[in-house]
Amino acid sequence: MTDVETTYADFIASGRTGRRNAIHDILVSSASGNSNELALKLAGLDINKTEGEDDGQRSSTEQSGEAQGEAAKSES
């Protein structure tokens, strides 16, 4: 019976009211990162691409793949 009382006393002393606060405890402990590091990481991202830049590369690659597939079919 004393084990239960000790566990209960520890729970009450922790200030937590249930599992709802468990996530908050984890987020607070992991938020110790440096904001300067975050700024440097965000500055390194390249988000200024011209519109359709990737689409043009993909479509030309897909077109060459389709052309090779059609050539293989015609040879067979």
Curated annotation (Swiss-Prot):
It comes from the Eukaryota. The inhibitory site contains regions very similar to the hinge regions (sites that directly interact with the enzyme active site) and 'pseudosubstrate site' of the regulatory chains; but, unlike these chains, PKI does not contain cAMP-binding sites. The arginine residues within the inhibitory site are essential for inhibition and recognition of the enzyme active site. Residues 49-76 are annotated as: Disordered. The keyword Acetylation applies. Present at high levels in skeletal muscle and brain but is present at lower levels in heart, testis and liver. The record marks R16, R19, R20 as: Important for inhibition. One of its GO terms (molecular function) is protein kinase A catalytic subunit binding. This is cAMP-dependent protein kinase inhibitor alpha. One of its GO terms (biological process) is negative regulation of transcription by RNA polymerase II. Belongs to the PKI family. The modification N-acetylthreonine is found at T2. Keywords: Acetylation, Protein kinase inhibitor. InterPro entries: cAMP_dep_PKI. Pfam families: PKI. The keyword Membrane does not apply. Extremely potent competitive inhibitor of cAMP-dependent protein kinase activity, this protein interacts with the catalytic subunit of the enzyme after the cAMP-induced dissociation of its regulatory chains. It comes from Mus musculus. One of its GO terms (cellular component) is nucleus.
